[in-house]
């Protein structure tokens, strides 16, 4: 089976977008993944591969094409609503406005998936003094 393609915007250096290829393989290490960057010149076509649409405002008219598309925490914006077909499985979107834009029940509105990066950050050291 071919690797799951991680779809994200990589035209401008934006932390939220650029953590996609770092974060998703850590969250789901049992799944073989590789980057499928979004380019400024148009729609990305993953062909017969499955695509994970994750962190960022990626739900728009430039939505990728692929065999099966999995949406986890993405937001709607930057133009027209995406063309969602039967091959799209939405687990959650970034918030209530994204859910409403896609005519989804409010229960699909979660939070920006970027908050998951916190699972892999070291714990902050305890503070012993007021200024340390």
Protein language model regions, located:
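Aromatic- and Gly/Pro-rich donor/ligand-binding loops
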Residues: 1-132
